[in-house]
A protein has these predicted regions:
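Alpha-helical transmembrane-bundle signature of multi-pass membrane transport and export proteins
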Residues: 1-440
């Protein structure tokens, strides 16, 4: 295997101008949100001197992102996605501008902060879902895993570097300039997205399920139930979101089990991202996998074993290694989940299906924190990790046995003619696979 084959495939960025624009917009969105989150937490705590006040802001953001994702998915299947993306990004820029104006006031208002946070959460949820739904129409079908790897890599890098940059800017100038910087960069990317071509939902001409074009969320649910591959991916994704890496256990384990302090805690929080970035940066082998369904299930099983290993670790070094393995396995899963869901979902339903995947991550994180905290109270932090890891590993095995269609799932591998126009630069969207061929 050549070293070049292991590196991340940037083909989608080379061949599709529209995907490049979407990609840049998503990167700026993630970095802006990460930077603003740090400034927001610092400002709210400085005003209230209360962790509860910070938690309220975080909860408002989580809930509104969830609502925005679901509503954005519904709208993405009913209207031109270019228009939806532009309105969402412009709204996010206004929310950041509102936070900046409020921060520069002699006495900032807490209610204004919460209002802007809610507005930005809704806009971000709509934007992320619409961007994810439209991306597959801008690249060739065989480039879906590569597009997923690029999206995953930027998400992981953003989760590590954006708070760091935000913290540096916050320490140097306060929250106002952080919010202002985020507002300006978000506004600039909105202007760049004006170059996108119209992106209406695509409908297969031979589709006989006309009632599914009403835009109803029930239609997406019916499709997921009927399509064994997509349905199994959504079910397994929900379990992984709920029972995956238990980050809320980190403080108690570090302070009581490992005998460490704040520095060790901070290092432990970076472990999953380190594993994820390493895999994303060397994801060429993933995008060329001959049996992506089997590899996805293996990654899900490995992630469960990593959580079990974390629970049994007994030391910070072993715990870090297990978390890095878990982060790496989770990224392999996410890349292939993205490609398989997008490939097996018709474009007219893609917004609603993607919104479910996005909502799973948000809602699963919130509910998962509560679940693992309760289990840790009944048993111990290590016991809670063992329970969660076992559930994830067993779920992967059950799905592998019960849904052979997912285990045998494949992705397009054909190489297009070099003289063909680049994906996403023409006027015709790339159609999704016929759903009747994916229900086995």
């Amino acid at each position: 295997v050549r070293a070049a084959d292991l590196l991340i495939d940037i083909g989608p960025l080379r061949t599709s101008r529209d995907f490049r624009a979407i990609f840049i917009a998503r990167v700026v969105s993630l970095f802006g949100l990460g930077m603003a989150t740090v400034a927001l937490a610092a400002q709210v705590f400085g005003m209230t001197r209360s962790t509860f006040g910070v938690a309220v802001a975080s909860m408002i953001m989580s809930v509104t992102v969830l609502v925005g994702s679901l509503w954005g998915g519904w709208m993405a299947d009913r209207t031109d996605r270019r228009t939806l993306i532009l309105w969402a990004r412009a709204s996010a820029a206004l929310a950041f501008a509102g936070l900046a104006v409020n921060a520069f006031l002699p006495e900032p208002h807490l209610w204004a902060i919460y209002l802007c946070v809610a507005w930005d959460g809704l806009a971000t949820g709509v934007s992320v879902t619409a961007l994810m739904a439209v991306a597959p129409t801008l690249v060739r079908p065989d480039q879906l895993p590569a597009a997923g790897a690029l999206i995953s890599l930027t998400g992981e890098i953003g989760s590590v570097t954006a708070p760091l940059i935000g913290g540096i800017l916050l320490a140097a100038s306060g929250p106002g300039p952080v919010f202002a910087f985020t507002a300006v960069t978000t506004g600039i990317t909105t202007l760049l997205l004006l170059r996108l071509r119209p992106l209406p939902p695509f409908k297969d001409e031979d589709d006989e399920e006309g009632h599914e074009d009403s835009g109803s969320p029930v239609a997406a649910f019916r499709f997921a139930v009927r399509n064994r591959v997509v349905g199994a991916l959504l079910a397994l994704g929900g379990i992984n979101a709920l029972f995956s890496l238990p980050v809320v256990l980190f403080p108690e384990l570090v302070y009581t089990e490992f005998g460490g302090g704040d520095f060790m805690l901070g290092v432990l929080y970076t472990a999953p991202a380190v594993g994820a970035i390493a895999v994303s940066a060397t994801s060429g082998w993933i995008t060329r996998a001959g049996r992506p369904g089997r590899l996805l299930l293996t990654a899900a099983f490995t992630g469960g074993l990593a959580v079990i290993g974390f629970g049994l670790s007994g030391s910070a070094v072993v715990a870090y290694a297990m978390l890095a393995v878990g982060g790496a396995a989770g990224t392999v899963y996410e890349i292939l989940e993205y490609a398989l869901v997008q490939h097996n979902t018709p474009d007219r339903l893609r917004g609603r299906i993607v919104s479910v995947v996005t909502a799973q991550g948000t809602a699963g994180g919130i509910a998962g924190d509560v679940e693992v905290a309760l289990v840790a109270r009944w048993f111990s932090p290590a016991g809670a990790a063992l329970v969660n890891g076992a559930i994830c590993a067993v779920a992967a095995v059950v799905v592998a046995v019960a849904v052979p269609g997912l285990r045998k799932a494949t992705l397009p591998r054909e190489e297009p003619d070099d003289d063909a126009p680049p994906a996403g630069d023409g006027g015709t969207p790339v159609p999704a696979v016929d759903i009747r061929s994916a229900t086995a």
